[in-house]
C-alpha cells in the first residue's frame, strides 16, 4: 500500500473522529491533525495500515474492545499514563483503563472508529494516476 494512501486514510479517520468528538461534546477533543506530534502520527499511521491495509483482514481489530486494547498499548509505548484529567503535555489520559470501565460515550467512540476505518478502507483510494 502506498504511504500516501495510508496518510489519506489516516487524515480522514482522524478528522472524522475529531468531528464526532466535537459533535458529541466529548470531554477530550483531539487537536487538529497538523498539530499532532510526530510519535502520535507514526503510531496512528501504523493503526490505519493495520486497519485498512492490503493485508488488514488478518491483522485488524474487529471489535471496539480489541481496538481499545491496541490503542492502550500504543499509548503506554509512547509513555502515556492513566490519570483522571487529560493532559497532553504530561501524557496523562483518563481512558487508559480496560474497555469495560470506559464511559458509554468512549466505548461508542471506539465502535465509530472501526466503522470509519472500514469506510476509509473501502472508499478512499488513490486516483488511477496516483499522486
What are these regions (language model features)?
Residues 1-131:
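Alpha-helical propensity feature that highlights long, continuous alpha-helices across diverse contexts
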Amino acid at each position: 500500500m502506498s504511504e500516501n494512501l495510508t496518510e489519506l486514510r489516516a487524515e480522514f479517520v482522524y478528522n472524522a473522529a475529531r468531528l464526532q468528538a466535537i459533535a458529541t461534546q466529548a470531554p477530550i477533543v483531539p487537536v487538529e491533525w497538523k498539530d499532532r506530534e510526530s510519535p502520535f502520527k507514526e503510531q496512528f499511521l501504523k493503526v490505519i495500515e493495520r486497519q485498512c491495509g492490503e493485508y488488514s483482514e488478518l491483522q485488524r481489530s474487529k471489535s471496539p474492545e480489541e481496538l481499545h486494547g491496541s490503542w492502550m498499548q500504543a499509548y503506554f509505548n509512547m509513555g502515556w499514563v492513566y490519570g483522571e484529567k487529560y493532559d497532553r503535555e504530561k501524557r496523562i489520559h483518563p481512558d487508559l483503563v480496560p474497555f469495560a470501565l470506559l464511559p458509554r460515550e468512549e466505548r461508542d467512540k471506539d465502535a465509530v472508529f472501526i466503522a470509519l476505518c472500514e469506510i476509509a478502507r473501502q472508499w478512499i483510494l488513490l486516483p488511477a494516476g496516483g499522486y
